[in-house]
Amino acid sequence: MKDTLFNESLNKRFCFDEKVAHVFDDMLERSIPYYHEMLNLGAYFIAQNLKENIYPKSLPKPLIYDLGCSTGNFFIALNRQIQQEIELVGIDNSMPMLKKAQEKLKDFNNARFECMDFLEVEFKEASAFSLLFVLQFVRPMQREVLLKKIYNSLALNGVLLVGEKIMSEDRILDKQMIELYYLYKQNQGYSHNEIAFKREALENVLVPYSLKENVALLESVGFKHVEALFKWVNFTLLVARKT
C-alpha cells in the first residue's frame, strides 16, 4: 500500500501505529536509500559468520535477534542467505507491525515474534543481533544501556548490525546532506508538504548521531572492531564484532 500518511499534517508525534504499519514497507523503500541492498549486505555478513560456526555450542542452532523488527523484512533476507537451521526472534513494541511480520513469514517455521519493549528483555546468548534504523528512535540516555545488554548477550565472535540515519558534525555539510536527502525523497514521489509534515512529526522522536558518535558508542560498550559496511550521504550500515 502506498504511503500517503503525510499528505496533511498529523498534528501529533510519529508513532508506529496501525496506519503506519499498513504503509510501512512502502515508506521504508521510498525513505531509506538502498534499503534492500543494506538488508542483503547485513544478511550476508551474518551468514558468513555462521559458516565459520560462530555460535554458542550450547545451542542446538544459531539464535539471531532482530530488535525493532517491524514487518520482518530482515528475516526474509536472512532466510534467503542462510542455508542452515537457525532460530529467529523478532522483538517490537508495535502489535500492528508484528501482525504484518507474522503474515509475511507464515511460510517459515524458524521465526517467532514477541511484542515487548526490547529495553526490558533478558536476551539469551545469541550469534547475532540487528538494530536496523531503530537505535535512532531510542532515547539517547538509554542507547548505551541497550548496547551493553546486547554486547553481554552476544557469543564470542558474534556480530551486531546497526543501520542508522546519521548527521554530520559540520553544520554546513549536515545542511547539504539533508537537502540532498530531501531531493532523493522528492524523486521517490514525496511532495514538499509530505516531507515537511513528516519532518515535523519526527522532531524529537528520531534523534540521529554522527557516524563518529555511533562508532564511539559501540566501542564504549566493549566492541573492538566496528566497520562501516555501507554509507550513502546520511545513512549507514555498521557491523560490530565481539572478540
From Swiss-Prot:
Keywords: S-adenosyl-L-methionine, Transferase. It holds the Pfam family Methyltransf_25. InterPro entries: CmoA, Methyltransf_25, SAM-dependent_MTases_sf. It catalyses: prephenate + S-adenosyl-L-methionine = carboxy-S-adenosyl-L-methionine + 3-phenylpyruvate + H2O. GO terms for biological process: cellular response to iron ion; tRNA wobble uridine modification. It comes from the Bacteria. Its EC number is 2.1.3.-. S-adenosyl-L-methionine binds at residues 35, 68-70, 92-93, 199. One of its GO terms (molecular function) is S-adenosyl-L-methionine binding. Catalyzes the conversion of S-adenosyl-L-methionine (SAM) to carboxy-S-adenosyl-L-methionine (Cx-SAM). Homodimer. Belongs to the class I-like SAM-binding methyltransferase superfamily. Cx-SAM synthase family. This is Carboxy-S-adenosyl-L-methionine synthase. It comes from Helicobacter pylori (strain ATCC 700392 / 26695). The gene is cmoA.
